[in-house]
Amino acid sequence: ANLLGRSIIRSNSMTSTGPSEIGKFIAHDTLRDAQKEMVIDGINILFKQGFLLAAAPTGIGKTAASLASSIEVARNNQNQILFLTGRQSQHKIVIETVRSINSNLDKEISEVKVVDLIGRESMCEDVDKMTGKCSCEDGIIESSRQSRRDDMKEYILKKPNHVDDIIEKSKNKKICAWATARSAVKDCDILVCDYNHVFVENVSESSLSAMGIDLENTILIIDEA
C-alpha cells in the first residue's frame, strides 16, 4: 500500500524533479505555492509506488493537496483511497473537499465517489453484543429490505455525503446505515474511516476484505500521522 501523509514542509532536499502538472482534481480555483508543490510531490511519489511523510501548519490546505494527488494517481492505476482519521471534524472536511473537487471537474471526467464510515455503535441502534445484530431493520420484510438498501446505496454514491446525513436518511428508510455504507465501499473512490481499519490487525482482516478492499492496491492518506 502507498502512504501519503496529509501535510508537508518544503525544503530544498524535497524539491520535485518530475512533472509539474497538478492534475485534474483540484478543490480550489487557485493554489498556494506550498499546496501546488505538495500535489506535485504526491503525484510523482505515488506513481513510483513510494510514500510521502510530511508536516505543515494548520490551514495550508493539506487535505485538498493530498486528495488531489491521490485521486490523480488512483484514477490512472485503478486504486482505491483510504483516508484514515480519528476526528469527526476531519470527516466533514474530507467530504466538503471532495464536493469542491467534483464541482470543479470538467464535464467529461466522472465525479469522485466517497463513502464516510464510522463505528457501528455510532451508526446503528441497539447493537446486540451477543449476536452482532442491530435493530435498524426490525419489521422490514426481506424483499423490501434489499430494495431499500439498493436505494440507499445509490444515494450514498451519487454525491459526497457526511456520515450524519447517511445515518439520518437510513433511519427514515428504516434501513441499516452501517451495512449499507459498507456495501457501497467496493464501488467508491475514497473511503473515509478510522485508523483501526488498517492498524488493528483483527479489525483489518475482517473489515477490509468484507468491504472488498485490497490493501495492496490502495493509497493511504493518514491524518495526523
Language model features: what each stretch is:
Residues H197, I213-A225:
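SF2 helicase catalytic motif II
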Residues L3-F25, D29-D33, N77-L191, Y195-F199:
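A substrate-engagement module of RecA-like helicase motors
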Residues F51, Q80, I190, I219-L220:
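Hydrophobic "anchor" residues on beta-strands that sit immediately upstream
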